[in-house]
Amino acid sequence: MFTQKSFEIFSIDGLEARMAEIRSEIQPVFSEIGQKLLTELSAKISNQEFYFHIAQHRRRTANAPENTWSAISTKARGYKMEAHFQLGIWEDYVFIYLSMIDQPKKQKEYAELLTNLSVEKMLTEDFIISKDHTKAEVFPLSAFSEAAERLGKVKKSELEIGRLWPKERFDGKEDSKILAEMLETIDQLLPIYQKLMEV
């Protein structure tokens, strides 16, 4: 599980130095939790094969990443081309999202479906959304409808929906509780995900 050291990594200066710590400290946690999320998904959607990916940030040449993430998708060679699940970390929180980022192939179809879905009624009120995977800012669930509409109208718009866990909770005392909440987050998002995969 993540620890306070996981969050401190984002204070390290320099691309190489920060990436070295991300690889040694954060990515093994992604793998550990990711396998549990993968097992959960595979049990719930048994007729679909899922693949686990870890962001490598290979295109970066100068700036160290301000966040990092892993993803679960139905594609072996990537994840951004479709709606997918993300487990990631910023300097002050960990998140799990159902993500539509970087102009997925069915962006307009996703937007149309989500605009007509009463998402606020399908999820508990502690869910939040992100409109840009490169920014730490999040918005309440009440902002979902507007963001879903924007996804259909603005080519470069993004939409992620899920939960976050503030870094203060990662003191080693709540690890099993946090993991249970993560699995439950996937479970709550599954009906939405399944509808997205049908479009």
Curated annotation (Swiss-Prot):
Alphabetical list of Pfam families matching this protein: DUF1054
Annotated InterPro entries: UPF0637, UPF0637_domain_sf
Top-level taxonomic group: Bacteria
The family this protein is said to belong to: Belongs to the UPF0637 family.
Protein name: UPF0637 protein llmg_1936
UniProt source species: Lactococcus lactis subsp. cremoris (strain MG1363)
Lineage: Bacteria, Bacillati, Bacillota, Bacilli, Lactobacillales
